[in-house]
């Protein structure tokens, strides 16, 4: 049946929504209604297969699933749902999944309305010329205002919302209406069945037994089991060992016809051969041009990831390679730290992405890790000479080498917030060195603030602070803007007079003292006391800007002296003093793992 389904009866669509607006629940109901998943196998968030996805209530990996639906007009349709993430960090996952669709369901919470993150994904869908169907979800909530949300969709996004589908995925209301809207309003794929094969790779993951499983959308031609295919960028030739669809588990069909979405297995053992966004064509009859318009993933946040036990270094590298297989946006290169030993400098899309990767390394691969404070990429030049890009404070040039010019990346951010919290948001953006651009009133209760902000200020704790200052009501999205010259300095943290490279950070001159002092204070609380005094200092070049001292243990050496000559006691105290001095000069301070973790979690 799948092999002979006509293009006019196929629909490829995605679901766009802000976190918590009910995207995964709608996907669950569609699977249930079309009988793709039996009641026995049904569980919440069925497409969110990772435990982490369920715990955090978010979608991290793109997933594809094929549904078969008999419409009211009596015809059978093949509906390919590509479930995409909704968080700002995973915008690349969204962009490549949207390229495999002709339409998108825009899910908006009837009580919360349009959020900033929804906007970012909708604009991506519009860029890809997708037909967008507005769906107002959670209409059963007491606070639901569907008519107001319709006006918002029209005013803020500029989409007509008269025929928006009203639904409550939780209670199964409006699911049939959604399916009928998909069939009648999303266009069918319109490709050439007789042209040379052209297929888009929109995701891939590594299976321990079968190698790389590649998610593809067939545009022109078709892919059959036994075909010889070629990957465009690497010119690597492969044989298709299996082709099929996700329903929602893998189901072999031996052929993927024009306009279909499914998977192929070619026995490839590394994802570097099947890069996301690449084009597949036939060896016998190749296409003339590859598919255009894919942006490669760009790492925005960098951090060192080190195994707690040096024996785990190789294991960590293998784990990162496997994760990179499923995640084109993760980058890593080996690096060495005096304090932490051998590890990797990893590039992430954002802080949530970093948190998820580190958590997956701990859970799925049982590796105990230490991760350093995240930083961004700076452009540095000395005496206006050649520009160098650095993402690690250790690479920061020495202030004595000449006139240093540093440029840092800025983002253009939009915050949608209830009007009673506008003051709090403006205050936060000013603290984070933001440049005010504009303020628009979306309706009588909400405003949209636009700011330019340094990316470095965003990656640490901006999102958490924004949520706490607006009681969780604000939503935020951003895009990279440009590099600007800033007055930045490198601050070293010295423990017992020795710099600990893992604690070094780059900060704006105005914030260097506060952040340095906060780290010193935190370390003085978590580093255990020793037999000798431990100074903890923050240094800007050779200038100490903050200091905390961990007092030494004092052994009562004169406890055994009962009465007697005072000189005897003095002699013992002098001997103790000498011993402590010698201990201090040769003693090594053991820095516990909690110290690294507490500095990472430290909020300004």
Curated annotation (Swiss-Prot):
Protein name, UniProt field: Elongation factor 4
One family name in Pfam for this protein: GTP_EFTU_D2
A GO molecular-function descriptor: ribosome binding
Family: Belongs to the TRAFAC class translation factor GTPase superfamily. Classic translation factor GTPase family. LepA subfamily.
The protein's role, per its UniProt record: Required for accurate and efficient protein synthesis under certain stress conditions. May act as a fidelity factor of the translation reaction, by catalyzing a one-codon backward translocation of tRNAs on improperly translocated ribosomes. Back-translocation proceeds from a post-translocation (POST) complex to a pre-translocation (PRE) complex, thus giving elongation factor G a second chance to translocate the tRNAs correctly. Binds to ribosomes in a GTP-dependent manner.
Chief place of localization: membrane
EC id: 3.6.5.n1
Single GO biological process annotation from the record: positive regulation of translation
Catalytic function, reaction form: GTP + H2O = GDP + phosphate + H(+)
Membrane topology: Peripheral membrane protein
Localization (cell): Cell inner membrane
Keywords carried by this UniProt record: Cell inner membrane, Cell membrane, GTP-binding, Hydrolase, Membrane, Nucleotide-binding, Protein biosynthesis
Gene3D superfamilies reported for this sequence: 3.30.70.240, Elongation factor 4, C-terminal domain, Elongation Factor G (Translational Gtpase), domain 3, P-loop containing nucleotide triphosphate hydrolases, Translation factors
Domain tr-type G: 8-190
